[in-house]
Each structure stands twice: as structure tokens, then as C-alpha cells.
């Protein structure tokens, strides 16, 4: 978990935020990493689970600039009006991430995302809803490879992804660790080829992945 949290934290801090919103914060490990590196950060830690939020409160009890809110996505989150502010949605499925981003009361323009599934669908959603993917990176931990993305909605030019970019990622194809990249794409290919009744889209994904691996 340490590598993944460190990777997410670095992408958050690169944006030099005054505040962060960890949506689905679980036990608060990301917030701890962030305030260790920048003690002046204001953090809003939210989770649908009151038990998880209680654990986060205990972990961060010495940090007075932390807020803890039981909420499903943005339902009860306050806008602290600190700019820039970065949202984090990590460890959730791509479909749930899409649902949270689409909430009418989403007031954030910068996010770091770490989807557990439905990554291609997430990229399609981002492209269709004026989100620009600025960074894509991979991190390997305990035998699993995780994708982490930074996205924003403040670019003057809207990013429209091609079908191939939705599958491979607009930046991921340039990831420097080619061995990890091929391993990641192979895992994606294995997932799609295992489907019993592949759709036309599934077949297209398989074709694109086979071309690059």
C-alpha cells in the first residue's frame, strides 16, 4: 500500500494545492502521507463508512487542519474555497468514480484517480465530459499493477481521445518502465480475452492490445 499511496500523494503535491479532498479515504493513510510532506495542507477526509472514518480520525488526531465527514461522494462535502484544491478518488471501481465525478455538486476541477476496474470506460467518460488527462502512471505493489491518473477541467483546449487512446491511454504508452507497461497491458488483454461472449468493443480492445504488445 505504501508505494501506491506515495505515488498518489506525489501527483497531488505536484499541483501545489492548498487543500485536498480524499473521497473514500478509508483509514486516512493518504492524508497522513500528504500532511507529513506538507503540514500546512488542509484536508477533507470523507467516507461512506463511519467506522473507516473513525479510524482515520484516530490516525490523524494530531493534525488540527483535518476535517472528517461521512458522505457518499460530494453529498455532504463543504467547499472550503481554497484554490487550488485537489480531489482524490482511489481504490474504487471506475464506474463508481464516474458516478462521483458526475455529481451535480462536484465543485473540484483537479483530481487524482486510481481506478480498480473499468479503466477504458473511465477514459471514455473523461473525454466525453471535458476532463483532460494530464498524467498517467503505473505502480506495482504486491503483484498487482495499478493505474494512477491526474485529470483536470481547467485546460483551455478540450481533450478528445481516440478509441485507441481510450484503450491504451493518451500518456501511458510513453511510460518509461516498458517491462511493467507490457505486463499491465497483458493483464488487460487477459481480462478481455477471458470474456465468454465478447462484444464488438471487446474485440476492438483485444485487437488494439495485440498490436502493441
Curated annotation (Swiss-Prot):
Keyword Endoplasmic reticulum on entry: no
Protein localization: Cytoplasm
EC numbers, comma separated: 2.1.1.-
Keyword terms, alphabetized: Cytoplasm, Methyltransferase, S-adenosyl-L-methionine, Transferase, tRNA processing
Class of enzymatic activity (EC top level): transferase
GO molecular function, one term: tRNA (adenine(22)-N1)-methyltransferase activity
InterPro entries, A to Z: SAM-dependent_MTases_sf (IPR029063), TrmK (IPR006901)
Any single Gene Ontology cellular-component annotation: cytoplasm
One GO BP: methylation
Xref: PANTHER family: TRNA (ADENINE(22)-N(1))-METHYLTRANSFERASE (PTHR38451:SF1)
Family of the protein in this entry: Belongs to the TrmK family.
Protein name: Putative tRNA methyltransferase MPN_351
